[in-house]
Amino acid sequence: MNHFELFDLPVALDIDLVALKANFLKLQQLHHPDKALDKDQALIMSSDINQAYKILSQVDSRAAYLLSLKKQDHHLDQSIHDFEFLQSALEIREQLDEADSQEQLITLKNEVKQWVDGLIREFKIDYSDEDWSEARDTVRKLRFFQRVLNDIDKAEDQLLDEDSFDLDDDF
């Protein structure tokens, strides 16, 4: 049984994330180790459910998983060789490093999401055309942008923490 089947979802890049979460919670409750007769088996199943959920909940890992189902997930850890993409990636990283306001981070996040949307469209075409080399390259780019989005979230949290605690505040 693949991860999509586990959560009763179609094998596709576009999935219903609300249904994924709901099915995840149902399965976790059903296979909770504290409620099972065979605790070891339930623990293994619970771990498998968690791993499958983690993979399907992010578009980059979901795309990589789709490639794995087609036995086309080799060399996903190779470097990206698209010079234009690398230049853009460097610029985005620099913008993130220099961002010092919530507004700048929101603008950057929106820009990155536009990139991701374009890459999702590319992946769907590559996948349906069975252009595995291009699909793998697109997954590499999606992974990069997922890391950038995670870093933007961390930067937003840091800014919020800095704004909420000021040494000049009176206690």
UniProtKB/Swiss-Prot annotation:
It comes from the Bacteria. Keywords: Chaperone. It holds the Pfam family DnaJ. GO terms for molecular function: ATPase activator activity; protein-folding chaperone binding. Residues 2-69 form the J domain. One of its GO terms (biological process) is protein complex oligomerization. Interacts with HscA and stimulates its ATPase activity. Co-chaperone involved in the maturation of iron-sulfur cluster-containing proteins. Seems to help targeting proteins to be folded toward HscA. HAMAP family: HscB. Belongs to the HscB family. This is Co-chaperone protein HscB homolog. It comes from Acinetobacter baylyi (strain ATCC 33305 / BD413 / ADP1).
